Structure formats: structure tokens, C-alpha cells
Regions:
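Short, Lys/Arg-enriched N-terminal segment that forms or immediately precedes the first helix
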Residues: 96-105
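Phosphate-/nucleic-acid-contacting segments
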Residues: 110-157
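Short beta-strand segments in beta-sandwich/barrel cores
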Residues: 20-24, 66-67
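Regulatory nucleotide-sensing modules
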Residues: 1-14, 18
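Cytochrome P450 core scaffold surrounding the K-helix E-X-X-R motif
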Residues: 25-30
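ATP/adenylate-binding site constellation spanning eukaryotic-like Ser/Thr protein kinases
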Residues: 18, 39, 64, 72, ...
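Cyclic-nucleotide recognition modules
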Residues: 32-91
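Residues that scaffold the ATP/ADP-binding catalytic core of kinase and kinase-like folds
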Residues: 6, 24, 45-46, 77-78, ...
Length: 157
């Protein structure tokens, strides 16, 4: 199910309680997965959500999912009229910043094998539920390279 398509203006910030959602863009006839939302995480086309400009990305569910969501106007109202809303905004911003910073550091400092192992440790069930091509894209390798990583890891165990 597509939640946000390219050229849409993102209106929702989702908090997943079940299921998996991915954020991606298409380039040169292939999809590049930027983010995978897991249970207990927020996901959105956040730049479009904040700027109210058209999205360059697609947000789609990979499995059946359940979520809570805030619309842009909901959050504006909460921020303006409640002190806990301001705290919520700060926490959301911090969580998104930390996630992006950790993801960037992962690509700069870790090998694809280490990124795969990190993902496996954080979300072991995901390896079985999500098509390998999306996992490969998420860790920055081709599906063939992911197959080689998995084969090497299973040989060493």
C-alpha cells in the first residue's frame, strides 16, 4: 500500500505499532531504500511534511501494518497550544536527527557486512519478512552482494 507517492505533499507523521514501511526513491530504473520503519518507530517523508512541498520519495508498506499518525495540522495545534506538544516536537526532532546521524555514520564507518549484522541484531525477524532486494538496498549493496554476505556468514557459523 502506498502511503505517500512522489509529488504528493506528505501530511502524516506515522508511528508504527506493527508491520514494516519503507521510504525509497527510484533512480535509473532501480529503487533506493532510504529508510525502513519498524514497530515502535516514526516514519514519514519528513522533508515534505515540514516544508509542505512535493515529495521526491515513496512511502509504502511492506507488510500489513498498524499505526498512529499525526497530521501536519494536528502537530501544529499541539505545538502551539500545549507545553507537552513542544516537548513532543523536541523529542521527535531529536529521534529523527539521531537516526539519520547513526545511519550516516554506519555508511561512513562500517562495512556492508557490519551493517547487515547490525540490522540482524536490531530486527532479527525482519530478515525473514522483507524481500532481500529491499534489505540489500537499505544496507547499500546489490542483492547479489547481500547473498554473498549471507553465505559467508553462514559458512563462518
Amino acid at each position: 500500500q502506498t502511503l505517500t507517492a512522489p509529488l504528493d505533499i506528505e501530511n502524516n507523521l506515522y508511528f508504527l505499532t506493527e508491520g514494516v514501511v519503507r521510504l525509497y526513491f527510484s533512480a535509473e530504473n532501480k529503487d533506493i531504500t532510504l529508510n525502513i520503519g519498524f514497530p515502535s518507530s516514526f516514519i514519514s517523508v519528513y522533508t515534505s511534511f515540514l516544508t509542505r512541498e512535493n515529495s521526491d520519495f515513496t512511502l509504502e508498506s511492506l507488510t500489513a501494518f498498524s499505526c498512529y499518525y499525526f497530521t501536519h495540522s494536528d502537530l501544529d495545534y499541539i505545538y502551539e497550544h500545549t507545553t507537552c506538544g513542544q516537548e513532543l516536537g523536541r523529542i521527535l526532532t531529536e529521534r529523527i536527527f539521531l537516526y539519520l546521524s547513526q545511519r550516516e555514520n554506519s555508511f561512513l564507518l562500517k562495512s556492508p557486512t557490519e551493517r547487515y549484522l547490525d540490522l540482524f541484531q536490531e530486527q532479527p525477524w525482519l530478515i525473514q519478512e522483507i524481500p532481500q532486494k529491499y534489505l540489500a538496498s537499505y544496507i547499500g549493496v546489490t542483492p547479489q552482494a547481500l547473498s554473498r554476505i549471507r553465505a559467508r556468514l553462514s559458512e563462518s557459523n
